[in-house]
């Protein structure tokens, strides 16, 4: 009985054929040009209350998904500190969830639920199922790509900058799109089909018909669109956990041989990447929780007792799967520090009750990549080791106003990051002036207020990494104001240059 599809007597089914022999259960009323799979006619018609519950639920989930994912795309695309190659995957995932929410949820499913049947015709039923398939598959394929990226960054940090380049990330995203489309398009060519399901208010893959074509398509879809991606994701995160444990053990040894500040910087960087990996794992777990019941329903329908699949049993997993598109923005808002800060800057009223915590790590807020080499000064009164920094991140602002030239000869070359101001750079970025300037031989530029420093001695003040609060005048001795250098080298004290 479950091996056939049916239509209302005398009307064409989803594939344009006639089936006049089917006698539907009284009370099942399909749209004028749609087929109702014979499987669903063995059950009583769905009550009006359930249709309204689904309609209200999908409206809420759809609107939250649209607003949340639009926010994610905007924040990640317009925040410099978030525009890294790895975050392109996050943007792609948000775009996928946004389209999924806008097409497969609100408003099409909402309108059909309130009408208690699919009202948009056969063509739109197939397009609806196709879009749901493409962007549902794109979500899990993107999560697979994210797990691979996290594996490389965490376990092979030295090779990550060459392996996960922006160009390669773009290529991986193209592969994700192509694979998702290829897995969703066969029903248009007779391998499988898109038909109404459950409450007859939405359309999806035909997982009920047990012909050879339909069954092989469901198996291929299940393997390449669900099981294999989950295996890859699982392997990557297991390797990440093992890599983190090895890293913790190595840090115990490295800390004894490295300067405390350098060890802290390296550990801070690793912990930052690990935090991002935990966010990715959370998103993945939520996706699996949302879609696993739906995948199980399809398997039972094909290889188990199909009579278990009642309209309500099929509809509840569908509702859970639709909600997957709204999870990710919530996870980022609760767990991603940079996303929270950027969101607070643009829509502070969202944080009326809980302002994001500001961590004392200015370098993390501004810089994403940093290479450090050490050079020793020669023919200079300064005999300490000076750090040579090069930053690949763009600056918040660059100014030469108020610069004072020191007349004392120096013989070292240095790239420095200099900021000026009193406010926290995370909440008041416009008040900070940040510059990356190379100090030439014989020229030391002091990026500070000329008015405060014109008649005073010039002090080269070094502040250790991750210190972003401005010291008091008393702590600086005779130096009013102050120059703040965010660096990762040794601490240098007492270098005085007379103007």
Swiss-Prot record:
SMART domains: 7TM_GPCR_Srsx (SM01381). The modification N6-(retinylidene)lysine is found at residue 322. The keyword Heme does not apply. Phosphorylated on some or all of the serine and threonine residues present in the C-terminal region. The chain crosses the membrane at residues 51-75, 88-114, 129-148, 169-192, 217-244, 279-302, 311-335. The keyword Lipoprotein applies. Residues 76-87, 149-168, 245-278, 336-499 are cytoplasmic. A lipid is attached at residues 353-354 (S-palmitoyl cysteine). GO terms for cellular component: plasma membrane. It is a multi-pass membrane protein. It is found in: Membrane. Retina. Expressed in the depolarizing cell layer of the photoreceptor cells distant from the lens. Glycans are attached at residues 4, 15, 19. Its main location: membrane. Residues 1-50, 115-128, 193-216, 303-310 are extracellular. Keywords: Chromophore, Disulfide bond, G-protein coupled receptor, Glycoprotein, Lipoprotein, Membrane, Palmitate, Phosphoprotein, Photoreceptor protein, Receptor, Retinal protein, Sensory transduction, Transducer, Transmembrane, Transmembrane helix, Vision. Disulfide bonds join 125-203. GO terms for molecular function: G protein-coupled receptor activity; photoreceptor activity. GO terms for biological process: phototransduction; visual perception. Belongs to the G-protein coupled receptor 1 family. Opsin subfamily. PANTHER family: OPSIN (PTHR24240). Visual pigments such as rhodopsin and porphyropsin are light-absorbing molecules that mediate vision. Rhodopsin consists of an apoprotein, opsin, covalently linked to 11-cis-retinal. This receptor is coupled to the activation of phospholipase C. Porphyropsin consists of opsin covalently linked to 11-cis 3,4-didehydroretinal. This is Rhodopsin, GQ-coupled.
């Amino acid at each position: 009985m479950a091996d056939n599809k049916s239509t209302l007597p005398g009307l064409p089914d989803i594939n344009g054929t006639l089936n006049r022999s089917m006698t539907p259960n009284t009370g099942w009323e399909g749209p004028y040009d749609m087929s109702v799979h014979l499987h669903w006619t063995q059950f009583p018609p769905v009550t009006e209350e359930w249709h309204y519950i689904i309609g209200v639920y999908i409206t809420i989930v759809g609107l939250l998904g649209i607003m949340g994912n639009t926010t994610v795309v905007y924040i990640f695309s317009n925040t410099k500190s978030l525009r890294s190659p790895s975050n392109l995957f996050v943007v792609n995932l948000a775009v996928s969830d946004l389209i999924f929410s806008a097409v497969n949820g609100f408003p099409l499913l909402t309108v059909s639920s309130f009408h208690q049947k699919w009202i948009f015709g056969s063509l739109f039923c197939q397009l609806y199922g196709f879009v749901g398939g493409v962007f549902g598959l794109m979500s899990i394929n993107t999560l697979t790509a994210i797990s691979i990226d996290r594996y490389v960054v965490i376990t092979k940090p030295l090779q990550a900058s060459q392996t996960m380049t922006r160009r390669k990330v773009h290529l991986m995203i193209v592969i994700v799109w192509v694979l998702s489309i290829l897995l969703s398009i066969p029903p248009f060519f007779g391998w499988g089909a898109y038909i109404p399901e459950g409450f007859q208010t939405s359309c999806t893959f035909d997982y009920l018909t047990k012909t050879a074509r339909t069954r092989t398509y469901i198996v291929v879809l299940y393997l390449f669109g669900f099981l294999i991606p989950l295996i890859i994701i699982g392997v990557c995160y297991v390797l990440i956990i093992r890599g983190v444990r090895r890293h913790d053990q190595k840090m115990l040894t490295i800390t004894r041989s490295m300067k405390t500040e350098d060890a802290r910087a390296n550990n801070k960087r690793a912990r930052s990447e690990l935090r991002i990996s935990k966010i990715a794992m959370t998103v993945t777990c939520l996706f699996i929780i949302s879609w696993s019941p739906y995948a199980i329903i399809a398997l039972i329908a094909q290889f188990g007792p199909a009579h278990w699949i009642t309209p309500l049993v099929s509809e509840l997993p569908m509702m859970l799967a639709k909600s997957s598109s709204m999870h990710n923005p919530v996870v980022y808002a609760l767990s991603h520090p940079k996303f929270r800060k950027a969101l607070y800057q643009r829509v502070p009223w969202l944080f009326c009750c809980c302002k994001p915590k500001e961590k004392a790590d200015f370098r993390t807020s501004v810089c994403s990549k940093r290479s450090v080499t050490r050079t020793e000064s020669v023919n200079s009164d300064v005999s300490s080791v000076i750090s040579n920094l090069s930053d690949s991140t763009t600056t918040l602002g660059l100014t030469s106003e108020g610069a004072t030239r020191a007349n004392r000869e120096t013989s070292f070359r240095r790239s420095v990051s200099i900021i000026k101001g009193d406010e926290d750079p995370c909440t008041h970025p416009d008040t900070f002036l940040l510059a990356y300037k190379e100090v030439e031989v014989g020229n030391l530029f002091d990026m500070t207020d000329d008015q405060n420093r014109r008649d005073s001695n010039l002090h080269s003040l070094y502040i250790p990494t991750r210190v972003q609060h401005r010291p008091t005048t008393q702590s600086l001795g005779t130096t009013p104001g102050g120059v703040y250098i965010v660096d990762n080298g040794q601490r240098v004290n007492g270098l005085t240059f007379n103007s």
